[in-house]
Amino acid sequence: MIFSPPLHHATLIKRYKRFLADVITPEGETFTLHCANTGAMTGCATPGDTVWYSTSDNPKRKYAHSWELTHTQQGDWICVNTLRANTLVREAIEQNLVNELSGYSKISSEVKYGSESSRIDLLLQAEDRANCYIEVKSVTLLQQQRGYFPDAVTLRGQKHLRELLSVVESGQRAVLFFAVLHSGIEQVAPAHHIDERYATLLAQVQQLGVEVVCYGAKLSPDGIYLCDKLPFFID
């Protein structure tokens, strides 16, 4: 995924009200960015970090600029725009970069499914195999050299796990895909210490057939690309 038009950078002053952040440019201009991330963003929004942002030409937008990347003072790159994860995973599948998800002839996004009024992020289909339902999650929380999900209690995430299990029970394939969008993360685990119910439920549905796939990414102001498969651990 290439950023076009190119991103620009500024220094983070503060993030607030979840969806907003104030920054200051190298020229001394201050303004407010939109932040498309509902999570806690722990370690991703420290005042003084470098923020890379995109700019929309839509005149109806209240905030023209969107926070895309953080370059931390420790040197890590993080994609904080969670809307990018689905695009990254779809591109990687279409380019046959994810071995676990190859061999399908059709890919669709945001398809309604399940008994709890959900929409699956990606649906893979082929004539010679069962449908594959993929729920994509962005991982950015780094603690003690390990990436954790979620970074806040997520009832919606728990619902998605139940829906994925129902897919498996219907004889189809269900995949929970962790897109690791933090350059410092080398392995992933469920965050028992943040959302114990989610972590317990994830362990249960994995044992019952929901697949878990984790891939890291190369991140820069030029673009983001999924690359290496990363290990997933249930402690």
UniProtKB/Swiss-Prot annotation:
GO terms for molecular function: DNA binding. Belongs to the SfsA family. This is Sugar fermentation stimulation protein homolog.
